[in-house]
Amino acid sequence: IMPEVISVDDDVAILRLSYRVGAANDYSSSDTYTVSEYYRIRQTNSGFYLLNFEREMNQVFDARNDLTSTAKINLGINSSTDVNCASDEKGIYTYFVNQGSLWCFSSSSQTFTRVFSFKGEETDSVREGYDAHNIKIMKIEDNGDATFLVSGYMNRGEHEGQVGVSLCRYSYSDNDVTERLFIPMAIPYNILTQNVGGVSYVSNDKFYILIDETLYSVDLVSKEVMTEITGLKENSYAVSDAGDAIAYSVSGDICNTDTIRVLNMSNDSAYELKADEADTLRPLGYIDSDFIYGMAHKEDICLL
């Protein structure tokens, strides 16, 4: 059991206990589950009082008996219905993330492959199972190869004990993962999830990533780092659904900008939208690859 203090405020504390359990299934074997229990406790002169209790339970995918007769992947019990998954254009290779591990399912061979995981096959998983990282599926090619991003605490491997961002490429034919870039970060995981990687994209040998309101590009061959955009404040920019384009206020002002610049990261091209002299523009979002923006007369804007 791994205890963790989530927060402490005066006489109230929130604690989390994380552990694993096993349970028999219908196939004469057992399944493994990760359990997180949250306790909200108050301390008084007379003792401790439990104010609230919550429990989450998630099944650990192991690729055994997890493919149904209708070719659906059975992920079992999960506390969320959201699944981090993506497929190639032909729908042959499906990548998905489960409990900190990246898996690939090939519909042509009807096989599962564990692409990336900190967990070992024959360990107690205490060190490897520390859950403080995210996996983002970046790109899947028609031959099954994939590019993905691991951000957070590195449980094992070359960067064990460090917090950072690792850009990796997986070769399906060779069943091999190659790290193309590692960016160490001197911040804890909970801060990293808020300030790093909100925008990330790979185009050929160029990698884009947003860190602390600045969009950087990295040449994956020469490792040269370039600053593309600065001052990307919340609500001052929008990213396309595919993640390959970003539209942002050139001035960085949410309610007073006369120019919006749209950067297409897939081909490194850009164009600008200009407002009339007495008007202002604001990026609102994307519908697929179509950029949506708002326009208003400056004299009609009243800031409270």
Name the predicted role of every residue range.
Residues V5-A13, Q43-S46, G285-S289:
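A short, structured loop/turn motif at beta-sheet edges
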Residues M2-S29, N134-D142:
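Surface-exposed, charged secondary-structure patches
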Residues S79-A86, D124-E141, A186-S200, G231-A242, ...:
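Repeated scaffold domains used in trafficking and secretory/extracellular systems
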Residues A13, V83-F105, K136-R169, V196-I211, ...:
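Short beta-strand elements that form the blades of beta-propeller/WD-repeat-like
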Residues V12-L17, A24-S29, T34, Q43-G47, ...:
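Non-catalytic localization/regulatory regions flanking kinase domains
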Residues R40-N45, Y153:
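Active-site-adjacent structural elements in enzyme catalytic domains
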Residues F48-G76, S101-E128, H159-N190, L210-T230, ...:
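Surface-exposed loop/turn elements that mediate protein-protein interactions on large endomembrane-trafficking
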